[in-house]
Every structure is written in structure tokens, then in C-alpha cells.
């Protein structure tokens, strides 16, 4: 399967108006949009061009502006790389949506509040392959996709929004996408996060999602969720950097031994579990642990200290996403299981 990931000969790499020669690294910016006062918003790109044939890997983070773990993961993973010993090349966009990043919010909230109807759709992550003459989200998606479609494969790094924490989990495009989806599966296995979701239902495999549209365009890609929104978490940054470097090793781009997790789970479906009552949320299960049907996941306590609900696992699975908010109302998610 690895051989279905395209290899490129070492040639000058054109990013925007900049040429990155083999054996060199560059930090550059691509014009994105212009604000009302004339301020130019630019997309940051790190290009590392090796001197030997190999894949061209796209790495992206922070398409949602509060997903800062991914920004740190990429800088940590790429800092030690020497382009003079790299096979292939890397196109890295550490902040895929600068306006959302400025807002420190999942979406560019000031633009959305100014004109909610004109800004719909607002989530660039769902707008691929994008439209260069569309709204803000569609322009961001089109600009990113212009980089992605020139690459051999892609990894898109996320966290939940504030109030959620994921285990390090690779979420694959639907197996129904054929050989490119198989190659994405192989790439995720090389990254070895310890948790892999292989499903054909739900948000992550919907049309318009970055990794879905990349895979449809024959650029095998997966979504990598890790850690908590709005936080820089040292342990998660280290873990994410390990997975990115594992992928580089598996692709033959750098020479080293992959570092593997103690256990690995391959799951078939997400199951979100929501509160039936409101109150203070006490999570009872350790993130990443396997649970049985009927195991207590969380306790909801009212403002007087009385337990009003004990949330039980409705199915056996793995506790892959925790809610870190201290209060919940009826209908809010308190846990997500990955079903085995």
C-alpha cells in the first residue's frame, strides 16, 4: 500500500512566488484575504525540500483557531529535520486559518458576528475543495487545497474545541474511497497513535471535510485529533510529535526507529453520550481506557451536592473523548466512546 503514495524527484519546490531549492528550508507566506482596513491576511507555510526522491507530505494544524496543540506539535516535529538528509519534501501550514487563530476561537468569530448569513458556511474545515471566489471559509479551503493537491499525502491535526479532550486518535476517510483510503489507513498505522477510527459514518467522513476531499483527489489523508482545545499540553505535544516523526520514518523520509504505543485500538464507530440532567460534571473513567457496558462514565451532581445522574456506558468501547467543562446542561455531551 505504501507504494501507492506518490514519490517526487528532488526538484525546486514552488510555493506561491517562492522557489525552495532541494536541500533547503523556507518560511514564507501566501496572500489569503484582505480586511476592511486594507490589512492583508497571509497563510504561513514552512517548506522543507530534501535532496533525495521521496513523498511530498502536507502537514496542517489550527484550521480551527483554538486548536493550538497542533501548532506546537508541528514546530516540535520539524525542528530537528535537516533538508540535506531528507528524502522527499514537506509542505507545512502550522496555522491553516489565521483569522480563527487571531480570535483564539474555533471560527473567525468577529467576521461571523458581523454578518452570520453571509459568512455561512463558516467552518473552513467542512468547505473543501473550496472556492477562490466564495466566502471566507471557502477561500481558505481553496487556498489550502491548492497546496494539498500537489502533495503525495496529508495529515490534518486537530483538537476538540474548548471543553473537550481527545486521546491521540487517527480518524480515517471512509474505506469506500478505495485505494487512496487504503493508503491513508497505512499512513495512520505508520504514525501509530494508539487509537485509530475506521468508519464510514459520521462527521469526519462527510463530504467537504479536508481529509475526505484530499483522499478523493488521490492525496491519502487522515484527521489526527489530540488533546484539549485552547490548551498547550506538554505530554500531548510530545505524543503528537512522536506520531508525525513516525509517519516520516514510515514514509522513508527520515532514517530512525519508529516509537510505538504500548497498546493499539482500531475502532468502527463513535458513540457520543449526552447528559439527561444538568449540574456539575464529575468524570469517573480514565481517558483512553476500555469500558464495559454499564460501567459508570460520569456523575452529574446538582448545585446542592446531590447526584442527579450517573452516566453509564451503553455499549462496550474505549473512552476516547472526555468533556472537561465543569458544568453541563441536558443534552450536552459528557463522553465519547470508540466502539470496537
Describe these PLM feature segments.
Residues 1-340:
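Structured catalytic-domain cores with a bias toward divalent-metal coordination
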Amino acid at each position: 500500500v505504501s507504494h501507492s503514495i506518490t514519490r517526487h524527484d528532488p526538484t525546486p519546490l514552488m510555493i506561491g512566488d517562492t522557489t525552495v531549492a532541494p536541500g533547503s528550508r523556507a518560511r514564507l507566506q501566501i496572500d489569503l484575504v484582505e480586511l476592511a482596513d486594507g490589512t492583508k491576511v497571509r497563510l504561513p507555510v514552512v517548506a522543507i525540500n530534501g535532496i533525495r526522491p521521496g513523498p511530498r507530505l502536507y502537514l496542517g494544524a489550527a484550521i480551527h483557531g483554538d486548536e493550538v496543540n497542533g501548532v506546537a506539535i508541528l514546530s516540535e516535529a520539524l525542528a530537528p529535520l535537516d533538508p540535506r538528509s531528507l528524502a522527499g519534501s514537506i509542505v507545512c501550514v502550522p496555522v491553516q486559518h489565521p483569522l480563527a487563530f487571531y480570535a483564539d476561537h474555533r471560527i473567525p468569530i468577529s467576521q461571523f458576528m458581523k454578518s452570520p448569513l453571509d459568512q455561512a458556511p463558516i467552518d473552513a474545515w467542512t468547505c473543501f475543495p473550496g472556492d477562490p471566489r466564495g466566502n471566507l471559509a471557502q477561500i481558505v479551503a481553496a487556498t489550502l487545497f491548492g497546496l494539498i493537491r500537489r502533495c503525495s499525502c496529508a495529515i490534518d491535526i486537530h483538537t476538540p474545541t474548548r471543553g473537550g479532550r481527545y486521546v491521540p486518535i487517527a480518524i480515517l476517510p471512509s474505506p469506500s474511497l478505495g485505494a487512496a483510503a487504503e493508503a491513508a489507513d497505512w499512513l495512520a498505522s505508520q504514525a501509530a497513535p494508539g487509537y485509530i477510527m475506521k468508519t464510514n459514518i459520521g462527521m469526519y467522513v462527510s463530504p467537504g471535510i479536508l481529509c475526505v476531499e484530499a483522499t478523493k483527489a488521490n492525496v491519502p489523508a487522515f484527521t489526527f485529533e489530540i488533546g484539549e482545545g485552547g490548551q498547550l499540553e506538554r505530554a500531548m505535544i510530545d505524543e503528537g510529535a512522536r506520531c508525525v516523526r513516525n509517519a516520516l520514518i514510515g514514509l522513508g523520509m527520515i532514517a530512525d526507529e519508529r516509537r510505538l504505543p504500548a497498546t493499539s485500538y482500531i475502532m468502527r464507530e463513535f458513540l457520543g453520550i449526552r447528559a439527561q440532567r444538568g449540574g456539575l460534571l464529575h468524570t469517573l473513567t480514565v481517558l483512553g481506557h476500555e469500558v464495559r457496558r454499564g460501567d459508570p462514565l460520569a456523575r452529574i451532581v446538582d448545585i446542592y451536592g446531590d447526584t442527579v445522574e450517573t452516566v453509564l456506558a451503553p455499549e462496550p468501547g474505549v473512552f476516547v473523548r472526555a468533556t472537561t467543562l465543569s458544568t453541563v446542561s441536558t443534552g450536552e455531551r459528557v463522553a465519547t466512546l470508540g466502539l470496537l
